């Protein structure tokens, strides 16, 4: 079961990594948060699993818009950067 979960996480994270390496460098940075939404999604999926990680990523993406205050929004609330 552990290998299947790991493989599923890697498959789900693949489009995020492709975005980070191929698309993100070509566009101007527009994420209102730090870490960026793609970094947040990748970390959430790897740490919490596919279902909870995707829900956390979708929640984050829904808050990232031009009218958002943005700022520092870590995956782990006690993380101080």
Curated annotation (Swiss-Prot):
InterPro entries: Membr_insert_effic_factor_YidD. Keywords: Cell inner membrane, Cell membrane, Membrane. The lineage of its organism: Bacteria, Pseudomonadati, Pseudomonadota, Gammaproteobacteria, Legionellales. HAMAP family: UPF0161_YidD (MF_00386). Pfam families: YidD. It comes from Legionella pneumophila (strain Lens). Could be involved in insertion of integral membrane proteins into the membrane. This is Putative membrane protein insertion efficiency factor. GO terms for cellular component: plasma membrane. It is a peripheral membrane protein. PANTHER family: MEMBRANE PROTEIN INSERTION EFFICIENCY FACTOR-RELATED. The keyword Cell inner membrane applies.
């Amino acid at each position: 079961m552990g290998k299947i979960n790991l493989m599923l996480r890697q498959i789900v994270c693949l489009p995020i990594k492709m975005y980070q390496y191929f698309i993100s460098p070509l566009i101007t940075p527009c994420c209102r948060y730090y870490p960026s939404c793609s970094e947040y999604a990748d970390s959430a999926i790897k740490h919490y699993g596919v279902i909870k990680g995707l829900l956390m990523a979708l929640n984050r993406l829904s808050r990232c818009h031009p009218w958002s205050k943005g700022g520092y929004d870590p995956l782990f609330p006690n993380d101080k950067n």
